[in-house]
Amino acid sequence: CRIYRHPVYIALRHKHSYPHHDAEDMAQSFIAWLIHGGYLRRADPAKGRFRTFLLTYLDNYVANQKRKQYARKRGGGVIHVPAEFPSETNRDAVEPKDENTPDKEFDRAWTLATFRAALDRLRAKFAEENRLAEFETLQDFVIRKRDANDSYASAAAKLGINEVALRQRVSRFARKFRQALADTIRPMVSEAELDDELSYLWRCFEK
């Protein structure tokens, strides 16, 4: 959940229209509630993607907080209204459909957080092999889409190798990154949905 705090913040800002500081506070309280309330145990990749699970629970958490706020303003004191969460089997019904919805802002932030987590996995492996400079150079071609015509020669010279060798390393790095990305999201989706989720994340990233 630490990794996905920013996507939660983005959803609170764009979907629920919270000001900056209120969104930060709400994101923190939501994550604490999710963890300490034991709700994470309800997340089951076989029944839906964790991305959808998290956004669904956030929407209902916000609705619950607003009901409590309204009750206090009405003078009825603090009351507890349980969040009416969707059943575990129909979470897919809340998947965003409109390409321009605030939910897409959440998905974009989710994608970037997931890519960062995958890059951190890969960076750690390169660090163990004393190859951080190579990591920084190679990730530019895979993640930042450097223009090959302008960059291969200078990058190869920087690493002290020829362009053919650099292209081979870029290709291997791309495969390793895809594997790191798959490993990052595997606990959050069913095996049957893994390829679809990977494709969706790449589409979000490339927009």
Protein language model features and the residues they cover:
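Intrinsic, short, N-terminal disordered tails of RNA polymerase sigma-factor systems
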Residues: 1-207
